């Protein structure tokens, strides 16, 4: 997964609280649009900070029921990526090895608990064709079963980008 796809999946996971799964997908894409990440990811990502994220989240219509708290979580994810993944979002997913270990990595991000981490892993595994068992979605998360096809399309749309270092 490239940097855009990696950050999208991480942020969609963080934002997946107090709103429907369908709304999370729409709002995460809209957040990328508001921040300019869908067009000039590498340049815009370098300049992200809490203030820019909060402004994008609180612009009408707000992108979450709790936009300021989510802005803190999203900005925190940028700082975690800087500190532990050399400022490169894709490194979080490149280092995927064993599901339990990866779940623990995801749970270090503010706003991601066990269920959200498992959901992100399921989406990642599906996208990378590591696991195509659709019954898993029904058992783990009914919302995911409804949205997995949309999620795959969004990840495809974020497509390939060049190597990136913050």
Q: Residue ranges of each PLM-predicted region?
A:
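C-terminal accessory module of base-excision DNA glycosylases/AP lyases that mediates lesion recognition
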Residues: 1-4, 71, 75, 96-106, ...
